[in-house]
């Protein structure tokens, strides 16, 4: 089990990676390619629905990756991109919740190196 300090440190590091200063007046998320079926948003949930996870389980209270899928689409973490639920890999077993899902979505943008 992760202690509270580790969780807070992880949350701060995640936000620093997602946002960069634009000037002394505020912050702005980086420009990202959210693929054809996704869109950029300021603070999406950290545990969205994916091919593997329902998105209904408990989740950390912080911003997730900068992209969200359009209605009817879910994240396929293998690509990563938004796909129709029916286009998810057939070998994926759906689960109700994910543990610290934020780190699972760091690659959901072509601006991140995920190799």
UniProtKB/Swiss-Prot annotation:
<protein>
    <recommendedName>
        <fullName>Accessory gland protein Acp62F</fullName>
    </recommendedName>
</protein>
<dbReference type="GO" id="GO:0005615">
    <property type="term" value="C:extracellular space"/>
</dbReference>
<comment type="function">
    <text>Responsible for physiological and behavioral changes in mated female flies. May contribute to the toxicity of seminal fluid and the decreased life-span of mated females. May also affect neuromuscular events after mating concerning sperm storage and egg release.</text>
</comment>
<dbReference type="GO" id="GO:0045861">
    <property type="term" value="P:negative regulation of proteolysis"/>
</dbReference>
<keyword id="KW-1015">Disulfide bond</keyword>
<dbReference type="InterPro" id="IPR036084">
    <property type="entry name" value="Ser_inhib-like_sf"/>
</dbReference>
<feature type="disulfide bond">
    <location>
        <begin position="47"/>
        <end position="59"/>
    </location>
</feature>
<feature type="disulfide bond">
    <location>
        <begin position="43"/>
        <end position="63"/>
    </location>
</feature>
<dbReference type="InterPro" id="IPR002919">
    <property type="entry name" value="TIL_dom"/>
</dbReference>
<dbReference type="GO" id="GO:0019953">
    <property type="term" value="P:sexual reproduction"/>
</dbReference>
<feature type="disulfide bond">
    <location>
        <begin position="69"/>
        <end position="82"/>
    </location>
</feature>
<keyword id="KW-0732">Signal</keyword>
<feature type="signal peptide">
    <location>
        <begin position="1"/>
        <end position="24"/>
    </location>
</feature>
<feature type="disulfide bond">
    <location>
        <begin position="51"/>
        <end position="88"/>
    </location>
</feature>
<feature type="domain" description="TIL">
    <location>
        <begin position="34"/>
        <end position="88"/>
    </location>
</feature>
<keyword id="KW-0085">Behavior</keyword>
<keyword id="KW-0964">Secreted</keyword>
<dbReference type="GO" id="GO:0004867">
    <property type="term" value="F:serine-type endopeptidase inhibitor activity"/>
</dbReference>
<dbReference type="GO" id="GO:0046692">
    <property type="term" value="P:sperm competition"/>
</dbReference>
<feature type="disulfide bond">
    <location>
        <begin position="34"/>
        <end position="67"/>
    </location>
</feature>
<dbReference type="Pfam" id="PF01826">
    <property type="entry name" value="TIL"/>
</dbReference>
């Amino acid at each position: 089990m992760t202690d509270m300090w580790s969780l807070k440190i992880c949350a701060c590091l995640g936000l620093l990676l997602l946002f960069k200063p634009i000037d002394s007046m505020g912050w702005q998320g980086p420009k990202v390619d959210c693929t054809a079926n996704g869109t950029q948003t300021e603070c999406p949930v950290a545990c969205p629905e994916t091919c593997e996870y329902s998105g209904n389980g408990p989740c950390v209270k912080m911003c997730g990756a900068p992209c969200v899928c359009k209605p009817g689409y879910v994240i396929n973490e293998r690509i990563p991109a938004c796909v129709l639920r029916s286009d998810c890999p057939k070998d994926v077993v759906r689960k109700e919740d994910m543990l610290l899902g934020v780190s699972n979505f760091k690659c959901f943008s072509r601006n991140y190196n995920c190799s």
